[in-house]
Amino acid sequence: MILLPDENWRWVFDEQRQSLLLDLSDDMQFVVSVPPKQLAQKQAFTEHFSLDDSSLYFHFLECLGEFPFTDPERVQIVLNAVAAVKYTRPLVSQSWYYRDVDMLSGEPELGEVFSVVTEFTYGDVMIISPGSNASLCIVISQAIQLDADKSLRQSSVCKLMNSKLLPYQAATQYLSKMA
């Protein structure tokens, strides 16, 4: 079941838990996976889920439509993506973990899905804030292993140089050449 936004949804920063929450109803809250160190605002606030938030929510849902997620997984990724767009402070690219594929012509589009390749694995990300040189992304794979000790799990937010983004349709062909 896909959750539909309504006028009662509210973003809340809980200072006690140091967590951003989406209050969906009196008895249901969604805890955003963005770590406090990546949030632009870390003091108590409450803000309604806006029309822009709803628009992003439905756009991201549509962009993930072809992927084999359960409805709860899809909603979780999308809510984390909307929260990241709205509340994440500017991040520094950590592109050194990723292989340079340089297969992108032009700027990526909002909601477009790409594959990324590291020394250890590959995974998929969705663009949540495109840029001309680097873009803010959310991990949609279960995890992406960056090095022997560090990995990004699903719904983690990262900034990547666009030269590291492998168009999703070309990923199979590219990855088969690597094997």
UniProtKB/Swiss-Prot annotation:
Instruction: Enumerate the InterPro entries for this protein.
Output: ZapC, ZapC_C, ZapC_N
Q: Where is the signal peptide?
A: none
What cellular component GO annotations does this protein have? cytoplasm
Q: Which domain of life is it from?
A: Bacteria
Its subcellular locations are: Cytoplasm
Q: Which residues cross the membrane?
A: none
Which keywords accompany this UniProt record? Cell cycle, Cell division, Cytoplasm, Septation
Q: Which one GO biological process term can you cite for this protein?
A: FtsZ-dependent cytokinesis
| Cited function | Contributes to the efficiency of the cell division process by stabilizing the polymeric form of the cell division protein FtsZ. Acts by promoting interactions between FtsZ protofilaments and suppressing the GTPase activity of FtsZ.
Q: How does it assemble?
A: Interacts directly with FtsZ.
User: What protein family is recorded?
Assistant: Belongs to the ZapC family.
> What is the designated name of this protein?
Cell division protein ZapC
Q: Which organism is it from?
A: Tolumonas auensis (strain DSM 9187 / NBRC 110442 / TA 4)
Q: Which gene encodes it?
A: zapC
